[in-house]
Amino acid sequence: ANFWDAFQLIPVSRGFWHAEHWFDVFPVRHHVPGTAYGLCLRGAFFYSGDTRPIPEVVAQYADGTMPLVHDCDLHGNPSHTGLPDLLREYPAEIIRQMLVYHYASAADGTALAAAGLRVAKAGDRLRLPKPQPAAQAHAASAGAI
């Protein structure tokens, strides 16, 4: 079987509709520009994808209620955020809304939690808030990024 037979690839620009919801898509900071993107269902979740800190992007989406799921390990690299980067680049009120993922080991997850971060663990489930009404989310995305 061909690996690509399992996927239907559809190019998108600033977002896409799925199940009557508007999903924003945005470029993130990765070692090769244009190779990594984030995703947001406004009101429900923000997902950073693989990225260096992107406080200017997060600020456009953070609403104080939805989880901001963000790439973070103990040490950063050209494609990923490290703990010092996260603490330096984001204000405390944004960090409190974050759920970090993409760390190297369970021990690293424990260290991130000890630093005061909420850490996603294998098998966790995250209850998401109800997303914004689709028309409102779509209209808001027109002014984003």
Residue ranges of each PLM-predicted region?
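Core dinuclear metal-dependent hydrolase active-site scaffold
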Residues: 6-60, 122-145
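A structural micro-motif
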Residues: 5-7, 21, 43, 65-66, ...
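Cap/insert and terminal regions of metallo-dependent hydrolase folds
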Residues: 53-138, 142-144
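Active-site HxH/HxHxD metal-binding segment of metal-dependent hydrolases
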Residues: 1
